[in-house]
């Protein structure tokens, strides 16, 4: 079996993975800013890095996985004011919602979920270190900014040179800055802001900037240098670039060894945005599709590729997952342990060790399903369930998935309806009213239900 290789955004190539401490992996992922419900782009970040930590653990590593929560931000302050509620109430409500969404998608809890507001002292210490190193200055408006041009390595992650950069999207233009590209480390308090977003500091009352939050939490929980830092491609610049500048500017050594970024999510080949009316929260998607279908849809694409969300692609994912569960119906896995030396398992591991190549890994799962259809082998069923379980799939009884409603919450009503229709069809056949029996079968098929007549008069059903 080949060793794990990871595409390192910083190096712009796949590299063999060698942790700082043998057998142990320290990993940080940028989490959610909790002022609204999580959308399908957040779902991809959750599922992708859940996959990464699952495979690392399955490979024998001891993993310390940190995914932060941004619970102080301009958007949070604005939303709380609009709602007329406290910031703590707003953020707790959406943290609870985020946890529910993550659990529905089969995302395991990180080892640590630090909230930014609990790490302000560490942020202040980091800013003081930057000031001592000549990289931070207080501007005329009271903010403390980072002097980008005084950090020689700025731009190495994004591949952008300072001369090519301009103050654009997500880069504040502020007349108090020495350079438009400088970014805020500490925001001075505004009179209209609530007291719960004001902290005392040597520079005056204020609150942390977005970028310093992640640097401080990561270094506090994982050390000044750690193995993997992940997040969405949209965070590569400026957020992750600025994290490097802050962390390495303070410590004077490498911050992160491997940078991982998952690709964008598009909707029907367009950028997802509220203005285009194609913005979907996880909850909206789960109202239409089973949560495992959504997870499978995300995992079928390579994490670095663009993911195109559409009903057609979700329908295809549901049908594909149905094929695998159908293969397991009536074939109970044997009780032996998963055999990672078996041929399918070796190919699965090869795929996962090749920068978490889930399209190839999923192809191996389909090969197993096809062989189970032919052989009805309990040993192969065990391999399929075991390998799929590593990536958080196929862990329900087959009949439970095959009977599941299109949307979460519909299962009970749908099952009752189908059972009643099957009984009516049985009675029609007993009365030799075969036209009525055929009509019931056709009506159920229109609703996405397939009936399968078995010996002895038994009828089973599943989703199409």
UniProtKB/Swiss-Prot annotation:
Predominant location category: cytoplasm
Subunit structure: Monomer.
Binding of Zn(2+), residues: 30, 214, 239, 243
One of the protein's GO biological processes: cysteinyl-tRNA aminoacylation
Subcellular compartments: Cytoplasm
Highest taxon of source: Bacteria
Position of sequence motif 'KMSKS' region: 271-275
EC number(s) per entry: 6.1.1.16
Motif stretch ('HIGH' region): 32-42
Binding site for ATP: 274
Record protein name field: Cysteine--tRNA ligase
Keyword ATP-binding assigned: yes
One cellular-component annotation, GO: cytosol
NCBIfam families: cysS (TIGR00435)
A Pfam family it matches: tRNA-synt_1e
Cofactor annotation: Zn(2+)
Reaction catalysis annotation: tRNA(Cys) + L-cysteine + ATP = L-cysteinyl-tRNA(Cys) + AMP + diphosphate
Keyword Aminoacyl-tRNA synthetase tagged: yes
């Amino acid at each position: 079996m080949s060793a794990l290789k990871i595409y390192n955004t910083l190096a712009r190539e796949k590299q063999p993975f060698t942790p700082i401490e043998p057998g142990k992996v320290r990993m940080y992922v940028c989490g959610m800013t909790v002022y609204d419900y999580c959308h399908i782009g957040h779902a991809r970040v959750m599922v992708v890095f859940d996959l990464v930590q699952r495979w690392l653990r399955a490979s024998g590593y001891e993993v310390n996985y940190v995914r932060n929560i941004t619970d102080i931000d301009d958007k949070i302050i604005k939303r709380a004011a609009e709602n007329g509620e406290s910031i703590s109430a707003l953020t707790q409500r959406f943290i609870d919602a985020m946890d529910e969404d993550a659990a529905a998608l089969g995302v395991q809890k990180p080892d640590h979920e630090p909230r930014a507001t609990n790490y302000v002292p560490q942020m202040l210490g980091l800013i003081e270190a930057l000031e001592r190193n000549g990289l931070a200055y207080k501007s005329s408006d009271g903010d403390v900014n980072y002097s980008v041009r005084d950090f020689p390595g700025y731009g190495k992650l994004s591949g952008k040179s300072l001369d090519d950069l301009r103050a654009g999207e997500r880069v504040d233009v502020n007349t108090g800055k020495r350079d438009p590209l400088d970014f805020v480390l500490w925001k001075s308090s505004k009179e209209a802001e609530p007291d719960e977003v004001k902290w005392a500091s040597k520079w005056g009352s204020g609150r942390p900037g977005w970028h310093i939050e992640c640097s401080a939490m990561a270094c506090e929980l994982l050390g000044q240098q750690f193995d993997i830092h992940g997040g969405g491609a949209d965070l590569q610049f400026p957020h992750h670039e600025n994290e490097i500048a802050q962390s390495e500017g303070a410590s004077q050594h490498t911050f992160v060894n491997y940078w991982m970024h998952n690709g964008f999510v598009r909707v029907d080949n367009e950028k997802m945005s509220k203005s285009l009316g194609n913005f979907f929260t996880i909850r909206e998607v789960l109202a239409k599709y089973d949560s495992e279908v959504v997870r499978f849809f995300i995992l079928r694409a390579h994490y670095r590729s663009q993911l195109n969300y559409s009903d057609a692609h979700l329908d295809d994912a549901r049908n594909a997952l149905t094929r695998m569960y159908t293969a397991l119906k009536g074939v109970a896995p044997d009780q032996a342990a998963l055999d990672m030396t078996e041929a399918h398992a070796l190919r699965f591991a090869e795929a996962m060790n090749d920068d978490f190549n889930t399209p190839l890994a999923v192809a191996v799962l389909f090969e197993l399903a096809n062989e189970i259809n032919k052989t009805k082998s309990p040993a192969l069923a065990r391999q399929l369930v075991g390998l799929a379980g590593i990536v958080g799939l196929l862990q329900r009884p087959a009949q439970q998935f095959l009977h599941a409603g299109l949307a979460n919450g519909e299962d009970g009503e749908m099952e009752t309806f189908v059972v009643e229709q099957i009984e009516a069809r049985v009675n029609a056949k007993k009365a030799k009213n075969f036209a009525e029996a055929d009509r019931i079968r056709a009506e159920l098929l229109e609703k996405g239900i397939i009936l399968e007549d078995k010996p002895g008069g038994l009828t089973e059903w599943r989703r199409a």
